[in-house]
Amino acid sequence: MIDLKFLRENPDLVKENIKKKFQDHKLPLVDEVIEYDKKAREAQQEADDLRAKKNQVSKQIGALMAQGKKEEAEAVKAEVAQISKRLTELEPLEKEYQDKVLEDMMKIPNIIDPSVPIGKDDTFNVENEKFGEPVVPDFEIPYHTDIMERFDGIDLDAAGKVAGNGFYYLMGDIARLHSAMTAYARDFMIGKGFTYCIPPFMIRSNVVTGVMSFEEMDAMMYKIEGEDLYLIGTSEHSMIGKFIDTINDESKLPYTLTSYSPCFRKEKGAHGIEERGVYRIHQFEKQEMIVVCKPQDSKEWYEKMWKYTVELFRSLDVPVRTLECCSGDLADLKVKSCDVEAWSPRQKKYFEVGSCSNLGDAQARRLKIRVKGEDGKKYFVHTLNNTVVAPPRMLIAFLENNLNADGSVNIPKALQPYMGGTEKLIPKH
């Protein structure tokens, strides 16, 4: 959510930003916000003036009664009653206008960074940099579930009977590999100075609307029936929510947290869930990182964060590249974002395994996360988030890039301590 004062003073700039995001249907919201904000402020001013007048006039009643001027006192009482009646009309009206302003402001996208490429959808995303040499081996690489089945490592049929499509059972060495990746990612981020956190796996609606747009909420979140609770789609949401309604000491910034959690998503978007596989599913695990920092530091943190993910993937012998997300591919709260994509030798192309985002002060405004500076003034922080590793997708990239012609899978040195010293997985079939 952008600053209301900024919108008042720069309506054309806000409209231009909406156009850059190819959301022309939201253009009327800007004028609507200005109109209702004006009405709300006028109602507030009238109410303030009437309260002052009521206080002033009310003082006359006692004096008039003491002077025996009962008739004049009754006239003043009638005037006070009229003022009170008008105030009872104004107060709900002011709230109605303010609620309308807030409702519209929540729909207006954040101002994107000037460096963001302009484009309608993800086909306009721009490749930034490649890390590691993409290799296509001289033997055929099976589909990832077929590789897992060679190790008796996955059972999709049983999961389908138990929970439906979009779920899985991981077993044996593949399950161990999954757990090893999350443990390694946890220690990797702790080594970068991040504080390890196990957050709530459910959050209230005020946190949900504080961290994401209504469109994202509808497409992603599972609601607990009869409760004001939602299953998290990413631990970023509950980690950022930790700071809701707080005024923080500037000297303690930045807050850097990393967490492991299960994640639950409806995947109602254009892609939907995968028929067979673990790429796009309803339930998965993820190691996430967030940063809460001073506004002037967020660009530097953004660069650090995506580089951490690249470093981790390269330590597991997986080639990756980064893609700069274009304006139309950015979620409404994001200022700037890039995807990290891993090389798939089977598909001979890259596929998304994570994303890094700078949200400016959008989440902080919604959640009222502020900082008190040395001068005593309060301001909103900036928030950032980044995928460290999402093991189901990482498994795909890892298995394909570390597969040998005989069906065995190499375990990189970085991961071996988390696999009991195992250097290679040997298939059972």
What do the predicted segments below correspond to?
Residues L27, K130-H429:
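TRNA-recognition modules of translation machinery and tRNA-sensing kinases, especially anticodon-binding
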Residues M1-P134, E149, G153:
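N-terminal alpha-helical targeting/anchoring segments
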